[in-house]
């Protein structure tokens, strides 16, 4: 049964390069602090934007800290990680962590920069059901590709969620993309944007995670600092 209100948070926790155990603990702390049904994290948040980081498996015991936090708060965490499929291909992915399981929810479709040297594109748009709400997903470059946005919106989504890594100079583009996706999809948008330095030449990142209304208005936002959380409770527009 669909809940009339969905509380969603976009988090930008501290991240240590290639330290999945430490990063899982910081994710768990963010889940507990957010007090939200859905908590979205940045691209490759479990490893940092380290393009040679080993893949993370869904049964990795280091993720138990996040599972336990989700159980304690009745939350779903959408975390960024490299994953390896049964076919041997490696993807930039969004993992869905709940009290019951860890699963791959989405694989990035549109790769940028040096990513194609290591990663393969995902199979296409995907949707995740949380408390009756349909969440469409994207990762960084996906958010700027019209075909991806159109195909995801066509799945009939209520919320579009994405994990990002951007420089401070890219923040205006990040905000414009979110507002555009919201208006085109007629959906709420939650962008979790990396804060603090990370790999890939990102000495500075934008942070400024935020949540937008279907009209493209900002409902909640974090600053550029590490540890920020944007949180909003959004109401089912079907009731209007």
Segments and roles (model prediction):
Residues 12-18:
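Short polar catalytic/cofactor-binding loops
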Residues 3-10:
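Extreme N-terminal starter segment of soluble prokaryotic enzymes
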Residues 62-76, 144-227:
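CN hydrolase (nitrilase-like) catalytic-core segments centered on the catalytic cysteine
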Residues 85-158, 167-176, 235:
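Active-site catalytic loop in hydrolytic enzyme cores
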Residues 16, 84-86, 197-198:
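Short glycine/acidic-enriched loop and turn motifs that connect beta-strands
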Residues 39-40, 134-139, 161-162, 190:
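Short hydrophobic-aromatic micro-motifs
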Residues 79-81, 92-96, 126, 191, ...:
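Short beta-strand scaffold segments in enzyme catalytic cores
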Residues 25-99, 168-187:
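Cys-nucleophile CN-hydrolase/nitrilase-fold catalytic domain and related Cys-dependent amidase chemistry
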């Amino acid at each position: 049964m669909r809940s009339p209100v969905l509380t969603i948070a976009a988090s930008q926790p501290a991240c240590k390069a290639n330290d999945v155990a430490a990063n899982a603990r910081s994710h768990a702390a963010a889940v507990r602090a957010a007090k939200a049904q859905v908590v979205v994290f940045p691209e490759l948040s479990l490893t940092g934007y380290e393009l040679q980081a080993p893949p993370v498996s869904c049964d990795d015991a280091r993720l138990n800290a996040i599972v336990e936090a989700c159980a304690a708060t009745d939350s779903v965490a959408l975390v960024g990680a490299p994953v390896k499929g049964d076919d041997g291909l490696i993807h930039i992915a969004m993992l869905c962590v709940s009290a019951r399981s860890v699963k791959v929810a989405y694989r990035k479709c549109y790769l940028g920069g040096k990513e194609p040297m290591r990663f393969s594109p995902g199979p296409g748009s995907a949707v995740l059901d949380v408390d009756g709400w349909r969440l469409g997903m994207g990762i960084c470059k996906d958010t700027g590709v019209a075909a991806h946005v159109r195909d995801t919106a066509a799945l009939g989504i209520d919320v579009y969620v994405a994990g990002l890594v951007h420089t401070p100079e890219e923040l205006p583009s990040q905000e414009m993309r979110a507002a555009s996706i919201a208006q085109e999809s007629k959906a709420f948008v939650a962008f979790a944007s990396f804060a603090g330095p990370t790999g890939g030449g990102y000495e500075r990142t934008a942070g400024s995670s935020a949540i937008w209304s279907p009209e493209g208005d900002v409902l909640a936002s974090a600053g550029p600092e590490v540890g920020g959380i944007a949180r909003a409770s959004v109401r089912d527009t079907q009731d209007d």
